Amino acid sequence: TPPCSGRFAPSPTGALHAGSLVAALASWLDARAHGGRWLVRIEDIDTPRCSTQAQHTIMRQLEQHALLPDAAPVLQSHRTALYQSALRQLLQHRLAYPCTCSRKQIAAALANAGNAPERHAGLIYPGTCRPALPSLNTSTQASTDDIATFDFATQAHTAWRLHIAACLQRQGIAEPSHITRWSDRSLGAQQQCVAHTAGDFVLRRADGLWAYQLAVVVDDAAQGITHIVRGADLADNTPRQIVLQQALGLPTPQYLHTPLVCTASGEKLSKQTGAAPLPEGHNSQSNRTQALANLQAAALVLGLPPSSANSPARALQQWVAAWVGKWCKNEALL
């Protein structure tokens, strides 16, 4: 059994807020409760929205709250070779394909088929550019030489999508409406038909940026992440990531999706909903006092008792045992 590894993976689009501190605290406590390591990954693949200043601010905030990673943080923007290799692997087995459809064209195709999405709902790709499934009697492997030398950057305005039906066929599943099932340590038994709910999702965007789903799956495997602890708003990403893990021959971690911090109107607290940066003190003593107060509030969201400690580091140690009792009791059922 591999040693436990957890991670916190913020996007450097701004400072940490109360909601992101809950995610950081939960992942840190879970790693420590399992005697494992805790890593920080800076998810900066959406480069136009990210900044180095925000990255430095995030790391400083984590240090103020005694949430110290066990290795230097890695940046997704430095890992494009890994993502290219994964996409080439999928292409070699005909599990991915190019798509030149714009969002407007996808919406029009859905409307023509009577499947127009509800307002604010995501567009489920109708398969306009999807190639036919390869015959089971013929080779399903593309030319290795052609794939190895292929330059994705030369394909302007072209996205690359996962061929879900081909992924299922490769596993011996002929029915495209196959249900992906998994067990969440908080939410319990979960299931989703990825083909119907998400469709052939994007792996590399038409603007040349790598998609979140591919990057997170590749990085979790490369970093040996065994326990993923994150907010409940990300739970619906899990089945897509499991399908992609299976297509790439990668292990599937354990998942725990934790409660969210919400606004007064019930929306998830985020930068988009006006979340303020974590409050700080004006000197080292007031900084420590404020950090402890921030952690106490985050622990409350996670159902943990108040800590009597007088420092962030001591409070964290007190909460490890409480975390085991609250969040690790269902692991034997997985």
Residue positions per predicted region:
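Residues that form generic nucleotide/phosphate-binding pockets
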Residues: 61, 86, 109, 128, ...
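N-terminal Rossmann-like or analogous alpha/beta NTP/dinucleotide-binding catalytic cores
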Residues: 1-118, 232-233, 237-250, 308-314
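Catalytic adenosine-cofactor/nucleotide-binding cores of aminoacyl-tRNA synthetases and other
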Residues: 102, 236-237, 246-334
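Active-site cores that bind ATP or allylic diphosphates and position pyrophosphate for catalysis
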Residues: 105-270, 274-283
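Short, Lys/Arg-enriched charge-dense amphipathic segments
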Residues: 59-69, 89-103, 118-137, 146-149, ...
